[in-house]
A protein has these predicted regions:
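An amphipathic alpha-helix adjacent to DNA-recognition modules
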Residues: 1-24, 34, 74, 81
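Structural signal for well-ordered, non-membrane alpha-helices
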Residues: 12-16, 20, 41, 81-85, ...
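Hydrophobic alpha-helical connector segments
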Residues: 19-51, 101-108
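Hydrophobic alpha-helical bundle segments that form small-molecule/ligand-binding pockets
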Residues: 25-26, 65-67, 78-104, 139-151
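All-alpha amphipathic helical-bundle segments outside canonical DNA-binding/catalytic cores
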Residues: 31, 71-75, 92-107, 123-126, ...
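Amphipathic alpha-helical segments used for helix-helix packing
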Residues: 32, 47-68
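Amphipathic C-terminal alpha-helical segment
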Residues: 43-46, 109-126, 138-147
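Hydrophobic alpha-helical segments that form the core
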Residues: 56, 98-118, 134-138
Length: 151
């Protein structure tokens, strides 16, 4: 059973309720990625690291028992990847020519989800911040490689 257009539409609405505010005042596509991560950091901070990604939490709990739910979760994650990939595609001239923006987008989402999970587990932003700092360093290195400048 495939996801209906209505389900895909609802997944887009959820994405846009987080993305639109995050990207409102940021025009640089790579900085949009980090603005999204900053929104999640703020949500964690404001909740003393109790808030997490509700879709990520649901995905951990409902991995196999319900294929229809799993499919909706996949639509949601695919939507996140697609939006981040769009940012990275817009910055293609600042990334190495062989950069796979789909894989990079998956890496960004995994960094966010893993950082959120660790922050909630340890009730501290330390792991989340370390993940984002490492991701920032990686993007800086990619951009330096693309331009031939020193890292």
């Amino acid at each position: 059973m495939g996801c209906s257009s209505s389900h895909r539409y609802k997944a887009c609405i959820v994405l846009l309720t987080v993305l639109a505010p995050a990207w409102k005042s940021v025009s640089d596509p790579i900085e949009q990625v980090f603005a999204l991560l900053a929104v999640y950091r703020r949500l964690l901070s404001d909740s003393d690291c109790v808030y997490g990604c509700p879709i990520g939490s649901l995905a951990l709990e409902l991995h196999e028992p319900d294929p229809a739910v799993r499919e909706l979760l996949a639509v949601n994650f695919s939507g996140w990847v697609s939006h981040v990939k769009g940012c990275l595609d817009a910055a293609h001239d600042r990334l190495p020519a062989d950069a796979d923006t789909e894989r990079l987008a998956i890496f960004v989402l995994t960094t966010m989800e893993g950082g959120v999970m660790q922050a909630r587990t340890h009730r501290t932003l330390e792991a989340f911040d370390a993940c984002v700092e490492s991701l920032r360093d990686y993007f800086n290195r990619l951009q330096a490689d693309a331009t031939g400048s020193p890292k």
